């Protein structure tokens, strides 16, 4: 990557990129002919490595711990309930395991939805229902949940029914749940170990999903489609077509960049699809836009567009394969594309600068896309790529070498890479997994120019997040202490702030939503506030446990005038766990613990336990505890 940057990449004339978007196919016949001709010219190679197998149903313990004119037009109104989710973009909600609706928490847990009333200063279990359609066996994975108005949406993936499953429920002011309807989107499995499949802006539900293509099968049967489950049986649906699927993408909404269209060696094995569904409609309605490319991808959702980075899109020989970056506007207008080198590590490698109409992307020479476990490892040179949105066109534009800013790395190995944009800075670190080192180099890049700062954190780095106007890096040292170090970004050059350690502890979960920081009401810059994060004291567990969730407590830290101090923990009572008669989605792929801050109240969700704490004099103590686990006899 460094050699390519130094050599420079010559762009096509800027006017071409500014004026031309991607060209769509004119008909199903043209698309089918194109795919068949490409298959004859360039038979698909055997994959370099096999993808992980479909998850096996495991019975886990029941209480296992842009510019304004580009904004998407949405229907309905934004939910008035405060956000309790640590999202990448402030105006874009992400599918999660706990949301708030009025005076109730809504929890998605092991194939069921639960509501807990918290509005009267107490905690009381109200209702629970299956998260899947009535009359089915729940043979699917239900991973994400969102709340829009008086609807609760559960997102899952069904291998039996063939695609992304969307289940809608009604919730009333008393917290009672009622099943409404279910739909399936034709798609591959969406699971990523770090990214989230669904986003919500207003009442618009947004998905990015890949679809494998078979050039010799009927193309109409492979295009994005939606079907509604009728409730009669598993195989009978309402809609068009023999299998009940109704197309939501005509061939005239399938695009391909000109360089890929002309290059018979380019990989076009996957249809990358962005789907927008109107949740406010009595019957779910969706529209989709699709682009062709290889199967290696990362995606990021801003308030205006979905960005999809396709690795190894155009062969260059001797490791010089070029990537294709797509910009797919959420308003349904024509997408654009451009070429680049390398690839992002995860969704946090992206940042849309709406004011400057630009996109920043952190890239490495070798990255493997978003899919299961791939973001955990990357390698090679790193750079910060800045692209004007006007460069997205017909795909002919190749980002020039001057668009990349080389980024320094720490000592080898550097395959565990973490990055986060915050304010006008990029903060990143590269090294081993935390716990294998007693210090880590943290780099701070001023986005407005200036020298890159290098800061030594006295522990490894497994997480980078935002605390007010500053950053926090979290990770273990070789003594099994979990370290929290603030990186002060405001009020002078970036510098190491305060550090606090939790002895004999590790992160209980890796996902971004497991972390939350609430600034104090009188501290708008976040210099004072409270931090929450699931931790585990069981240090003998498999290293993979942190990716699936192994939280045995939620730890809290106080920050006062930028000084960090442990505030205590709210712990799970695993010894009181009982059989929940789990029927579906019985593995916590998205974890099971979250800190929750609502007004001046503080909660810890750990499996089926919801614990409220009271903060006083910098310490948290248990105030109330609720076990909302269902029993076999009480199950609906």
Summary of predicted features, one role per range:
Residues 15-636:
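Beta-sheet-rich non-transmembrane sensory/scaffold domains
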């Amino acid at each position: 990557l460094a050699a390519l940057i130094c050599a420079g990449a010559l762009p096509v004339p800027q006017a071409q990129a500014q004026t031309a978007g991607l060209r769509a196919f004119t008909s199903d016949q043209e698309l089918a002919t194109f795919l068949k001709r490409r298959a004859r010219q360039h038979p698909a190679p055997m994959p370099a490595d096999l993808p992980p197998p479909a998850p096996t149903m495991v019975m886990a313990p029941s209480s296992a711990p842009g510019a304004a004119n580009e904004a998407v037009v949405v229907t309905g109104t934004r939910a008035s309930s405060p956000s309790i989710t640590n999202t990448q973009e402030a105006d874009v909600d992400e599918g999660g395991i706990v949301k708030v609706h009025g005076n109730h928490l809504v929890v998605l847990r092991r194939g069921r939805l639960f509501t807990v009333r918290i509005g009267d200063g107490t905690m009381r279990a109200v209702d629970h229902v299956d998260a899947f359609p009535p009359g089915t066996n729940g043979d699917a994975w239900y991973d994400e949940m969102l709340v829009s108005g008086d609807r609760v949406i559960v997102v899952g993936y069904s291998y039996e029914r063939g695609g992304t499953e969307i289940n809608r429920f009604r919730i009333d002011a008393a917290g009672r749940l009622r099943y409404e309807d279910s739909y399936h989107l034709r798609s591959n499995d969406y699971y990523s170990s770090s990214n989230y499949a669904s986003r919500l802006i207003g009442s618009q539900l947004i998905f990015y999903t890949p679809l494998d293509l078979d050039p010799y099968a009927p193309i109409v049967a492979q295009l994005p489609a939606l079907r509604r489950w009728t409730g009669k049986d598993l195989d009978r649906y309402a809609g068009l077509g023999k299998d009940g699927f109704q197309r939501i993408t005509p061939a005239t909404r399938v695009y391909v960049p000109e360089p890929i269209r002309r290059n018979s060696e380019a990989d076009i094995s996957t249809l990358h699809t962005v789907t927008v569904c109107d949740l406010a409609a009595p019957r779910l309605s969706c529209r989709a836009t699709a682009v062709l490319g290889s199967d290696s991808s990362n995606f990021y959702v801003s308030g205006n567009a979905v960005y999809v980075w396709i690795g190894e899109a155009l062969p260059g020989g001797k490791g010089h394969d070029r990537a294709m970056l797509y910009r797919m506007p959420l308003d349904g207008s024509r997408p654009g594309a451009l070429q680049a080198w390398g690839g992002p590590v995860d969704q946090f490698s992206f940042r849309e600068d709406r004011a400057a109409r630009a996109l920043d992307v952190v890239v490495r020479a070798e990255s493997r896309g978003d899919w299961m476990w791939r973001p955990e490892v990357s390698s090679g040179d790193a750079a910060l790529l800045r692209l004007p949105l006007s460069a997205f066109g017909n795909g002919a534009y190749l980002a020039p070498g001057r668009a990349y800013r080389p980024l320094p790395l720490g000592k080898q190995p550097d395959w565990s890479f973490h990055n986060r944009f915050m304010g006008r800075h990029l903060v990143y670190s590269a090294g081993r997994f935390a716990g294998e080192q007693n210090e880590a180099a943290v780099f701070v890049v001023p986005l407005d120019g200036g020298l890159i700062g290098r800061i030594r954190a006295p522990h490894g780095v497994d997480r980078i997040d935002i605390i007010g106007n500053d950053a926090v890096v979290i990770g273990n040292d070789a003594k099994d202490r979990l370290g929290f170090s603030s990186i002060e970004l405001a009020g002078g050059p970036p510098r190491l702030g305060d550090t606090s350690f939790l002895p004999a502890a590790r992160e209980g979960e890796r996902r971004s939503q497991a972390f939350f920081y609430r600034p104090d009401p009188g501290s708008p810059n976040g210099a004072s506030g409270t931090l929450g994060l699931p931790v585990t004291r069981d240090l003998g567990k498999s290293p993979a446990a942190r990716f699936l969730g192994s939280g045995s407590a939620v730890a809290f830290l106080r920050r006062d005038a930028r000084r960090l101090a442990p505030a205590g923990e709210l712990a799970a009572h695993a010894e009181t766990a009982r059989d929940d008669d789990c029927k579906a989605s019985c593995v916590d792929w998205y974890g099971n613990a979250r800190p929750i801050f609502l007004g001046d109240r503080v909660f810890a969700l750990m499996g089926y336990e919801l614990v409220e704490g009271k903060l006083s004099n910098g310490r948290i103590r248990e105030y109330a505890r609720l076990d909302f686990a269902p029993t076999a006899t009480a199950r609906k």
